[in-house]
Design a protein with these regions (language model features):
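Acyl-donor binding region in acyl/amide transferases
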Residues: 42-45, 93-202
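Short amphipathic alpha-helix that is part of the acyltransferase structural core
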Residues: 23-65
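Short hydrophobic/aromatic beta-strand or adjacent loop that forms the aromatic wall/cage
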Residues: 69, 210-215
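Conserved beta-strand in the GNAT
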Residues: 73, 80-97, 106
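Short, cationic low-complexity segments
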Residues: 228-236
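Short, P/G- and charge-enriched loop/turn segments at secondary-structure junctions
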Residues: 59-61, 198-205
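Replication-associated primase and helicase/ATPase modules
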Residues: 1-19
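A short helix-loop-beta-strand connector motif used in the catalytic cores of GNAT acetyltransferases and
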Residues: 63-78
Length: 236
């Protein structure tokens, strides 16, 4: 999933961790200039087009997720005349691409631009809005393939449910990675045998991720009960 990232390396994830684990209500001074305080940011929902642009520009996947139910974003102040300034971070919440026995909503993209903004503040505001909309259990996955460990979720007091085993997440077709959902959309299947029959002159190999760290947050007692039924553990 996509997760906290300007680019997809571990160093950036660590830098993001430094940013978000600082105080979000006051400027957190860093050697390179510090983070923008949450008090100077505006939280908004529904700014999907602008948020999609951020994903295409800054997120390592360069792909907008499917089945999006809500987009939350942070904006700089609009200045003297009020209103919103530029978007500086966005979070996409979707119906999960993997099947769950009960309804949950998944954080499928978390992205920031060049400005150092407190992503924990964005996740927290999104959680409040999702609870208002009736959701009771949030999940997200930090992709080890991209060097992500889930520092934002830890700093946001989410529960850690362990690391999922390596899984087939798509195909490599003539050297280019295609996620499983993209294969289904483009070709009507993600079966390697069927794809090889469809494209006999292409090189097609399965792609496996390195496993994903699972994090979750219950929004009330109903969500806690659902998490227990789903076998989600507390800080495995």
């Amino acid at each position: 999933t996509g997760y906290v990232s300007k680019v997809g390396d571990g160093e950036t994830a660590m830098n993001n961790a430094t940013i978000v684990e600082g105080r979000t209500t006051a400027r957190h001074h860093l050697a390179d200039g510090g983070a923008i305080p949450a008090s100077s940011l505006h939280f908004r929902t529904g700014r999907r087009q602008e948020a999609e642009g951020m994903v295409l520009t800054y997120h390592y996947s360069k792909r907008v997720p499917s089945n999006v139910q809500m987009v939350g974003s942070l904006h700089l102040d609009g200045g003297l005349f009020g209103g919103d300034g530029p978007m500086v971070a966005a979070a996409f919440w979707s119906i999960p691409p993997t099947r769950w026995a009960e309804p949950v909503i998944e954080l499928t993209r978390l992205v920031r631009g060049d400005d150092r903004v407190p992503l924990t503040f964005l996740v927290s505001r999104c959680a409040k809005e999702l609870k208002r909309q009736g959701y009771d259990l949030l999940v997200s996955f930090a992709d080890r393939t991209q060097g992500h460990e889930g520092y934002v979720y830890r700093a946001s007091n989410w529960n850690y449910a362990g690391c999922r085993e390596r899984a087939n997440d798509g195909m490599v077709i003539d050297g280019a990675f295609h996620p499983g959902r993209t294969c289904n959309s483009l070709f009507g299947t993600r079966s390697i045998d069927k794809l090889r029959q469809m494209f006999p002159h292409k090189t097609i190999e399965p792609h496996y991720d390195e496993g994903k760290h699972c994090y979750w947050l219950a929004l009330g007692k109903r969500g806690e009960a659902k998490a227990a039924r789903l076998g989600l553990t507390h800080n495995a």
